[in-house]
């Protein structure tokens, strides 16, 4: 298989990954707005997909640069590494989707890419310093989402304390459309940029680009793929995210989405690739805990956290195994 054919395969698989990312993470964008019955599932996925795409015209490419050249030394990257890394990430996403686990597509990509790079060139392939912030934010992003959600919940509770519950419910049913749009913007910019990073790395490795600058067509294609995946949805995970962790009202849904949006947009601004899944889960737990700790179904939360911990090493193992298996096929 020649280099150009491999490049085309990598681009196709990256867009497939972005589609699966939107499909897998659709639940994060719309679980709260569906579970509170503000929108039907069909309208919710259209709403989220639209704002996923609009994010292409709002934010930069700092996260793409972190993924593409900040975690693996770009000079050792070739099409085989990228191909195996993508297949590892897609395989992990598929396994966790079948199991109904809301794991992180972002961390699956990081793990698959890193595992394939190590299989190719050893641990010297990794930019060790580039892994510090993403790994640190595995733990920090849900904590930040949790704290911001508690703060938003407490603040908005104080603002509406003198109004009748039915009136407050009507207000927040409308406001949840805004918060869901903001969250989908944050989801779109943070997650679509990861695919941009991989495609741009492939273009550099294949000699199509002289410097690491993300082409505009790559930005548009990644956002279109993610929007399409979001429209396809991931309904089993929606149930876990929307109701099994804690029961949400429109007021709580607004607080969770607003907290998630603020966290995702802030980290995207600083080029930190975080997990939308981790962020919104932390925010939903924060909403429940602001009422009382017993409102959170901690058994479900522990199962989700366990899946998070396994994502990077699990996807890395798949990426490494697939790289070794593919040596004879793509010489």
Question: What are the language-model segments listed below?
Answer:
Residues 1-331:
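Multi-pass alpha-helical transmembrane bundle typical of ion/small-solute transporters
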């Amino acid at each position: 298989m020649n280099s150009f054919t491999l490049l085309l395969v990598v681009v196709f698989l990256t867009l497939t990954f972005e589609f699966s990312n939107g499909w897998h993470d659709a639940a994060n964008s719309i679980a709260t707005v569906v579970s509170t019955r503000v929108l039907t599932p069909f309208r919710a996925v259209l709403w989220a997909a639209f704002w996923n795409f609009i994010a292409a015209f709002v934010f930069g490419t700092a996260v793409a640069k972190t993924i593409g050249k900040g975690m693996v030394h770009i000079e050792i990257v070739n099409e085989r590494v990228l191909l195996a890394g993508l297949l590892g990430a897609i395989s992990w996403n598929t396994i966790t989707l079948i199991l109904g686990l809301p794991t992180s597509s972002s961390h699956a990509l990081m793990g698959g890419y890193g595992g394939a790079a190590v299989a190719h060139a050893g641990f010297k392939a990794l930019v060790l310093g580039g892994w510090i912030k993403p790994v640190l934010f595995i733990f920090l992003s849900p904590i930040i989402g949790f704290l911001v959600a508690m703060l938003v919940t407490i603040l908005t509770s104080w603002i509406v304390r003198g109004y009748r519950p039915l009136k407050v419910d009507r207000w927040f049913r409308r406001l949840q459309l805004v918060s869901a749009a903001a969250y989908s913007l944050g989801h779109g910019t943070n997650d679509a940029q990861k695919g941009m990073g991989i495609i741009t790395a492939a273009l550099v490795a294949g000699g199509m680009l002289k410097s690491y600058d993300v082409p505009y067509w790559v930005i548009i294609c990644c956002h279109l793929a993610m929007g399409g995946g979001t429209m396809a949805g991931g309904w089993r995970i929606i149930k876990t995210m929307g109701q099994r962790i804690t029961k949400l009202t429109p007021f709580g849904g607004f607080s969770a989405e607003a907290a998630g949006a603020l966290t995702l947009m802030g980290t995207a601004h600083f080029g930190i690739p975080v997990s939308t899944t981790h962020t919104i889960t932390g925010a939903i737990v924060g909403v429940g805990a602001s009422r009382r700790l017993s409102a959170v179904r901690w058994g479900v939360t522990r199962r989700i956290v366990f899946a998070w911990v396994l994502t990077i090493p699990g996807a890395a193992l798949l990426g490494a195994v697939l790289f070794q298996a593919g040596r004879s096929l793509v010489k």
